[in-house]
Amino acid sequence: VLYVYLVNIITQKDNWSKIRKLFKRFQKNKKINCVSIPVKSLTKKSDKAEQISNWWKSIEQKSIELALDFDYLFETDISDCYGSLYTHSIAWAIESKSVAKSIKNNSLLGNQVDSAIQSMQYGQTNGIPQGSVLMDFIAEIVLGYVDEQLTKSINLEKISNYQIIRYRDDYRIFVNNPNDGSKILKLLSENLIEIGMRVNNAKTKDSSDVITSSIKADKLERYLIPTTKNPAQQYLITI
C-alpha cells in the first residue's frame, strides 16, 4: 500500500515536473556523467537489452575513449549504499537542505517521500528498501544530489581536468594528475558522510593502466582472445 502511495505522490503532474527539473539540474556538470538512469527502449529490443547495451556504451566503451585523454583511473563504490542512506537526505535533495530543515511538515514533496519511506521501515531514518525500480529511482535522486555537492567541492579546489562516470554507487574518476584523483576521492567521501554514506575502502583503487582497469576481467580475456565477432572493439583495446 505504501509503495503504491509513494508512486502516486511522485507521479502527480506537478511533482513529476519538479523531479524532472531536479535531474536536469543534477546533470549540469558534464564532467560527472551518471549512466544508471533507467533506459526506455525505442526499438524492438527489450528495456533490459537496451539497458545492457547502454551500459557497455556509457561505461566500458566510454572508459576506453577516456583512456586517450587521461592517464589515471581511480575507482570506488559506496559501502552498503541502500542500507546506509539517510532518509532525510531525500528531502534535502528534492527541496534543498535549508528548506527541508526549516519546513518539516508534509507540504513539501521531499518530506512526503521521506515520511513514506520511514513508514515502510517502522520509522527508521537509516536505509531504504532494496529490490525495486522505485527505490533505485529514489537512490538516484540522492546520489544526483551528491554529484551536485561534489561539483561544488571540486570547483572550490579549482580542479578542472577530470571526468567522472557514475553507475549508481560505482564511481570511475579519470584524471591526469594523481593528486587530483586523491583529492576528488576525499571530497566524495566528505560529501557522502553528510548523508550517512561511506566510501568502500576495500574496493577503492587506482591505476595508470586505464584501459585494462576499465574492463571487467572476464570481458578483457574474451576480447584479447582472437575472434572475428568484435574486430573493431578488439582493435581498440589492443592498440
Locations of regions flagged by a protein language model:
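Conserved two-metal-ion catalytic palm core of "right-hand" nucleic acid polymerases
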Residues: V1-Q130
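Active-site palm subdomain of RNA-directed nucleic acid polymerases
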Residues: S102, F137-R168, I173-N176, G181
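Glycine- and acidic
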Residues: D71, G123-L134, R168-F174, I239
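An acidic- and aromatic-residue-enriched active-site/binding cleft used to recognize and process polar
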Residues: I78-C81, Y167-Y171, N176-N179, A202-K205, ...
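Amphipathic alpha-helical scaffolding segments
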Residues: H88-V99, Y145, L187-L192, S207
